[in-house]
């Protein structure tokens, strides 16, 4: 009788585990122009964890997209100056992956010119070039990929800027991370990316 009870309990536990939906880590950026959603890759755990930690601390909420170059990138976080990189809370070892490239909407970590190619924990960029930027591959770490909000990316990338590529009208940031199920991802129009997500996670 005890064996039967244990067997039933075991089957119940297995059944509950099977019914638990899988959630995925998603980055979220809110700006005055609109919202963007992007995957956070498991293949770059140091950068992913860093992004999640700073987002949960609301680190970027007082900062902005301070460097905007059409057909290149939009960049935000710590100021795009040597002092800005010096003020980064920490640096991150590179996590290059030959299968993750600088395509349109790729999200990467910025850095200054250092031989180890260490990333500045506070600064990130999003690729705007629809043809991709292959020269950045294996030089800058990508940790995410936009799947919703490309229209927002385009609008920010085409804003009027000054001689330092700073937007004339400040683009403030509110950065968070979300947990989403497949159903929630589909509701946001991410259907075409679900197969890739299953391969990644």
Please give the residue ranges for each predicted region:
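Sec-dependent N-terminal signal peptides
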Residues: 4-13
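Cyclophilin-like peptidyl-prolyl cis-trans isomerases
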Residues: 16-201
């Amino acid at each position: 009788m005890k064996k039967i009870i244990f067997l039933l309990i075991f089957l119940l536990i297995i059944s509950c585990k099977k019914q638990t939906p899988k959630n995925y880590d998603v980055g979220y950026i809110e700006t005055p122009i609109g919202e963007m959603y992007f995957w956070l890759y498991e293949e770059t755990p140091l950068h992913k964890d860093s992004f999640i930690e700073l987002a949960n601390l609301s680190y970027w909420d007082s900062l902005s997209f301070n460097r905007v170059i059409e057909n290149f990138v939009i960049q935000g976080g710590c100021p795009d100056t040597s002092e800005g990189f010096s003020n980064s809370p920490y640096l991150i070892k590179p996590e290059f992956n030959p299968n993750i490239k600088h395509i349109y909407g790729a999200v990467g970590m910025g850095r200054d010119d250092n031989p180890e190619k260490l990333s500045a924990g506070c600064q990130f960029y999003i690729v705007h070039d629809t043809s991709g930027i292959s020269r950045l591959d294996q030089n800058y770490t990508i940790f995410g990929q936009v799947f919703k909000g490309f229209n927002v990316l385009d609008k920010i990338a085409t804003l009027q800027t000054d001689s330092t590529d700073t937007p004339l009208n400040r683009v403030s940031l509110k950065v968070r991370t979300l947990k989403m199920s497949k159903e929630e991802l589909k509701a946001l129009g991410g259907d075409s990316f679900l197969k890739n997500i299953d391969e990644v996670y």
